[in-house]
Amino acid sequence: MNASQENLWPAPFASKSLDATVVVPGSKSLSNRYLILAALGHRPVRLVGLLRSRDTELMMDALRSLGVRCEIDEQVDTTVTVVPPSDGRFHGGTKVFCGLAGTVMRFVPGLAMFADGPV
C-alpha cells in the first residue's frame, strides 16, 4: 500500500440488502427534451414528474407559440399533457421568447424549421 492509499476514506455500505423507493427531483434539461419529443409526436403525450422551472415554462410557452398545447394537470402540476398540432405542422408567423433558457435557444430553432411560416 502506498502513502496515497493509506489516506483513502472508507465508503459506507449497507450491512444487509436494501428495499427502498427514492423520489428523484426532475431534471430541467431532461424535462425540456421530453417536452420537445412529445411535441414532435402525432398524438397527445402525458408527462409525469416534469420539473416545473422558469426554463420549462419558457419551453412550454415556445411550444404553445408553435401551436402545441401544453395542458398542466390541475391536481398535480408536475403532470403535463402535450398535444401536438392537429394538422401535424408547427405554426409559423410567431415570435418565441427564449429568456436565458439555453435549451430553448438550442432546440426551438430546429423545430421552427418545420413550421408553416417564419418564426
Residue spans for each PLM region:
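Short, structured segments at the rim of ligand-binding sites
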Residues: 1-119
